Amino acid sequence: LDLTVPAAHAQVNRAALEAGKHVYSEKPLATDREAGRELVKLAESHHLLIGCAPDTFLGAGLQAARAVLDAGTIGTPVAASAFMVGFGPERWHPDPAFFYAPGAGPLFDVGPYYLTMLVHLFGPIAAVNASAVIGRRQRPIFSEPLKGSLIDVTTPTHVSAHLEFVSGPATTLVTSFDVPASELPRGEVYGESGTLSLPDPNTFGGPVKVRLVDEPEWRPVPLAGDYEVESRGLGLADMAATIRSGAPRTAARHRASGALALHVLDAMQSILESAEARQWRTLTTSCERPAPLSTEVAA
């Protein structure tokens, strides 16, 4: 279980795999796609499993949202939006400088929750287009023990992306550490016959709501399963269950898989590359849409 800072993930994960260990990593899998790709290939060549956070898409809230989509309640999804906006971690984190270095920023730090949620709902991403800015080149720290120190910002702090999914939905994703206050939703899916309101993908619960075109009010969706609060470790439990089952280890059979994490990493790097080049980027990876969580996984 790798809980090191993002810049160390590739090195630590590689060392564990080379020592013959299965690996479950904090997100992101690595800070660039080639390092992530090498980790997935290394795991496959050693007949080992590699998994990666986040696993919040396995929680009761996003499992309920998935069930709504799979049931066709809002019709075919046409578009979606997701927003992770705030004012940055320097007001609460004791040592927040790494949040403003390559491999972090709002996209790499919190973006994996949102991108993993979207891939869980829609499947793999085909291409991205984006713009990005560094809101302030230096940011003061407001938390102890480094209060008053300045952080040199070297990665974008406001990123706006358009995601083109293989399955079709045109999706907007905004991640930002430059928003003092906002009333934007965490996420919404717009179907042919209704809208699905998504929960915070950095949590395991709700609320999940739906409103059809002929309905005057939003109605709550019952959550799916028992994992509503503080259920971090579901992805690791799912991977452990796969290992115990004796299933072939050459495929990403567990849900929070290395293939999923690599695809999310590819999407994030492609977003930043698109913003820098001011042009569309086609992703070079893909993954399976994770299967819904079965009730026995974390038993």
Residue ranges: model-predicted function:
Residues 1-42:
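Beta-loop-alpha module in the N-terminal Rossmann-like domain of NAD(P)-dependent dehydrogenases
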Residues 4-5, 73, 175:
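Short glycine-/small-residue-rich Rossmann-like dinucleotide-binding loops
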Residues 19-21, 46-48, 169-170:
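A short helix->loop->beta-strand "cap" motif at the edges of active sites that frequently abuts
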Residues 25, 31, 50-52, 173, ...:
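Hydrophobic residues in well-ordered beta-strands that form the structural core
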Residues 48, 75-79, 273-299:
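C-terminal capping/lid region of NAD(P)-dependent oxidoreductase domains
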Residues 56-152, 278:
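Predominantly a Rossmann-like dinucleotide-binding segment in NAD(P)-dependent oxidoreductases
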Residues 116-204, 233-250, 270-271, 288-299:
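Contiguous beta-strand/loop segments that form the cofactor/metal-binding neighborhood of enzyme cores
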Residues 220-224, 242-264, 283:
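Glycine- and charged-residue-rich phosphate/anionic-cofactor binding loop of Rossmann-like
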